[in-house]
Amino acid sequence: MVMLLKDIIYKGIETVSTLYPEREAREMVFAFLEHQLGTKRHTHIMEPAYEVSHEDAEAAMSAFGRMAAGEPLQY
């Protein structure tokens, strides 16, 4: 099952903003996705149907959970 990039972004921001201010959480999510998936900050706007594989989506959600637990983005 694939997920849309925009859904991953929204869930990521929601998860990470439990520890960080929303603006900072947004920046962290975009930075992670740019590095991990090679997407740009505007990809979800330019390509609303951009799909992410199940494996990549799960890896992203796991990383967002770790960020929300205080693990630095660099790890």
What is the meaning of each model-derived region?
Residues 33-75:
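Conserved AdoMet
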Residues 10, 26, 30-34, 61:
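Short amphipathic alpha-helical segments
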Residues 2-7, 30-34, 38:
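Membrane-targeting and insertion segments and their boundary/processing signals
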Residues 2, 16, 29, 45, ...:
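Extended aliphatic helical segments
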Residues 1-26:
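Non-catalytic nucleic-acid substrate-recognition regions in nucleic-acid-modifying enzymes
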